[in-house]
Amino acid sequence: MANIVVKKLERTPIDETPVEIVERKGIGHPDSICDGIAESVSVALCKMYKEKLGVVLHHNTDQVELVGGYAYPKLGGGCMINPIYVLLSGRATAEVLDKETGKIVKLPVNTTAVNAAREYLKKALRNIDLEKDVVVDCRIGQGSVDLVEVFDRKRSEIPHANDTSFGVGHAPLSTTEKIVLETEKLLNSAELKAIVPGVGEDIKVMGLREGKKITLTIAMAVVDKYADSLEEYEKVKEMAHKKVVENAQKYLNGHELEVFINTADDEECIFLTVTGTSAEMGDDGSVGRGNRANGLITPFRPMSMEATSGKNPINHIGKIYNILSNIIASDVAELEEVKECQIRILSQIGKPITEPKILSIEVIPENGFTLDDVTKKATEVAEKWLDNIQNVTEKIVEGKVTTF
């Protein structure tokens, strides 16, 4: 039986506080590149394991490192000089031993991992030449498992927590959070790239709300081959600015908006790139240094420092409970009695993941409602998701869950 505690959140609703800061690192930021690769490798390994053995074996691929390359960008088109270096590390089960026959089944861990990383880079960075601009090196530590253990796992219904750890989540997103998230999604959308191809993928959106005014400061890489002159570079920024302001109108909810793009630019130095990412110019990246599981960095909300991307989706609490916390928070926030919700879930190592040590639900009731009106419904939401926690794992394995 899960230990679920529902209490009133004794704080001002986030949208009514005087100041809020929210950040999102776009998919081409070096840290986000590492997050994306780590998760893509994990998903690919999950699919390979299921195809070969019908069950996901132990792995953690959350140790991806990116070492920045060296490029010579110039208006009209520059070139890469030294490639970006990507190191895949972590651990994965690479062989299964059948003790009865003495046979060992080898599993293509390295091939699967490298292919997944390269496919992700191809998808995420439109202007990168995979043959020349990036080196992918696989140093994933390889382990083995007994075939009997594999079949035991198939029969085992509920995985046990790999660690004593916690996950956190909140809902609904504040006005500032929505605008920051949707702004980066817009700038990295296929629709916008078709109109303004000069917009690179390395985008960081920093949102500041002061009262009813939201200020967005955006760092946005521009791809050099789409800007033959400084005037064309500025035109890329102007078109992006216009689209950001237009898109934000859907989420402003009465707030004033001010948008700045590439405020460090001057005549001697602009954010010009060959590939669309600062990783080409010495900016390094690591898994877990950027967005949390909900895609945002939110210093005015509770956050976990745990990297979600690349961890195994079967029993790694740092992954499952962070994703689950956000799902439960979203469902609780949908209740008419709830204005705002925060979730914290704590595991205990070795215990079933359906039985957390505590699942804390904190709510701000809507006007006219009390905590008593909320408690039973919120508890039922949490119990439903705990009972169906393996549905969360399935969504992760299928690549249907965002981890950064």
From Swiss-Prot:
Keywords on record: ATP-binding, Magnesium, Nucleotide-binding, One-carbon metabolism, Transferase
Gene3D superfamilies: 3.30.300.10, S-adenosylmethionine synthetase, C-terminal domain (3.30.300.280)
Cofactor: Mg(2+)
Binding-site residues, ATP: 141-146
Keyword Cell inner membrane: no
HAMAP family documented for this protein: S_AdoMet_synth2
UniProt name for this protein: S-adenosylmethionine synthase
Organism: Methanococcus vannielii (strain ATCC 35089 / DSM 1224 / JCM 13029 / OCM 148 / SB)
Gene from which the chain derives: mat
